[in-house]
Amino acid sequence: MPAFETVVIAYRAEEAHSRIAADRCESLLHKVGCRVLKGPTGPQDNPYPHFLEATGGHIDLAIVLGGDGSILAAARYLAAVDVPILAVNVGGHLGFLTQPPEVLGGRYWERLLAGEWELEKRMMLQASLTGPPPLPERQPYFCLNEFCLKPASEMRLTSIILELAIDGEIIDQIHGDGLLVSTPTGSTSYTVAANGPIIAPSLQAITITPICPLSLSSRPVVLPATGTIEVSPLRDPDLNIKLWSDGAFAAPVHPCQTVRIEVARHPTRLLILEEDHSYFRTLREKLKWAGTRIQAERDPECLLPPQNHP
C-alpha cells in the first residue's frame, strides 16, 4: 500500500515550470500506486472544490506548486479537512511558506514516500458577519495570513472609522485606511508592511494592526489566541467597506454589521521535508538580514578583535 493513497496536485496555471513539475510529480506518484488528481490554481482557477467533491474530502496529501499566494488559497480549503500540504516554491516570489524545488526529487522524494517528514501546524483565523441582513450565505471565512477590513472605492481614497472590541470590551475607535487582524504566519506579510511586529509562527497569538491611522496613539496590539475580536464600522457613507481574506475578497460589510474574528478550529498542516528547516533562516534569506556569525561562515577572521594601531 502506498504511503499516500490519494494525492492532489495544484500548480500555477500561468507558469510553465509549475505545470512541468506537476506532470513529473503525477508520474512518480502513479508509479507507486497513488491516486492523483491535478488542477491549475490562480486568479481564475480554483481546483479545490473539485478535489474535495471528487474525493469526499479524503485526501492524504496536497502538493502545491507555486508561491505563497498558492499556499494561502490551498489552506483556506484544505485545513478544515486536515490535509497536509507540501508547499514547493515553483515560480513564486518570496516563498515564506514554501520549500525549495529540490524537495521534489532525489533523497527528499524518498523521504516523502517513506514517511520521514515533519508536520508544522500553523494557526488560522475564522471570521463571521453578524447583524442585520444582508448577511453572507456561506460563513465562516478562513485565513492563514490575515483578515483585512478596508474601503474599496473606485472614485476616491477614503478613510473609515472602526470600533474595536476584544472579548466584549470596547477598546478603541480606529480612524484610518483600514485594519489588519493577523496570525503569526501573516506577521511577515501585509502586517509587517503596516509596521506591525514579526511573530514566530510557533506562538499562539493574534495581532491587530491599524493601516495608516490618523492618530499616533493607534498602535499594533498583540493578543493571546484565546480572545474574540469584534470590529464594527462606525462611518461608511459610501458603503465601501470590504472584508478580505489573505488578499482575496470575502464579503461586503454593511452598516450595523459586526465582523467577529477568532482562532479557527483546524490549523494548516505544512509537510516539511528539509532536515535543517529553520524559520529564522528563512527570515534572514527573505528579508536580507545579516550578522557577524553569518559572515564568519565565509570569513572567520571577522570575529577576531580589532587590533590597536599606533
Curated annotation (Swiss-Prot):
The lineage of its organism: Bacteria, Bacillati, Cyanobacteriota, Cyanophyceae, Gloeobacterales. The gene is nadK1. NAD(+) binds at D68, G69, N145, E146, R156, H175, D177. One of its GO terms (biological process) is NAD metabolic process. It catalyses: NAD(+) + ATP = ADP + NADP(+) + H(+). Keywords: ATP-binding, Cytoplasm, Kinase, NAD, NADP, Nucleotide-binding, Transferase. GO terms for cellular component: cytoplasm. This is NAD kinase 1. The active site is at D68 (proton acceptor). It comes from Gloeobacter violaceus (strain ATCC 29082 / PCC 7421). SUPFAM superfamilies: NAD kinase/diacylglycerol kinase-like. It is found in: Cytoplasm.
